[in-house]
Amino acid sequence: MSATHVWRAVLISLLLSPGLIAQSGGAASSTTQCNLDDGRQVYMRYNAVSAKNEKLSNGKPWTPGGSPMTLFTEAQLTLGSSMIPIGAYTVYPIPARDHWTLAVNKNVTPGAGYDEKQDLARAPMETAQVAQPSDTLEVAFAHVGARCTLRIYIGKTASFAEFTAK
């Protein structure tokens, strides 16, 4: 069995685990993915929370529904000028009035708090206001070539960050 098949099996099992937890009464979890041209994939798991129930604090890492988003990647990625190796990471959007920042963190221990010293990558996000507000958190990838652009929509805010596969 090739390393790619092993990684896929691990990622699929990790992605299915939250669905089982959600069925047993835990927080609802959603997943979005980006399929790269060479067949490798990038996944983001997050809690699809209501925009009305979330409090975003300027300059503070945001954990939708009390849990960070989780990034799984089968490809080496860059975010800004930082390299992100193949693996699993926590992702923290950091809202601000005019722009957001995206932090990719090495600590994937369940229940662990955010520790900036564990950041592997940080990059500014393009941020805009949209005319039609989103009632729930929506996270999606837009794929072009070797790039997966992460799109986060909550309320009237839309923020974007670009990951590039190596």
Regions found by a protein language model. Give the residues of each.
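Cleaved targeting-peptide boundary
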Residues: 23-30
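Extended, well-structured beta-strand/loop surface patches
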Residues: 37-86, 92-166
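Bacterial N-terminal signal peptides
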Residues: 8-19
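Generic detector of short alpha-helix boundary/capping microenvironments
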Residues: 10-11, 27, 69
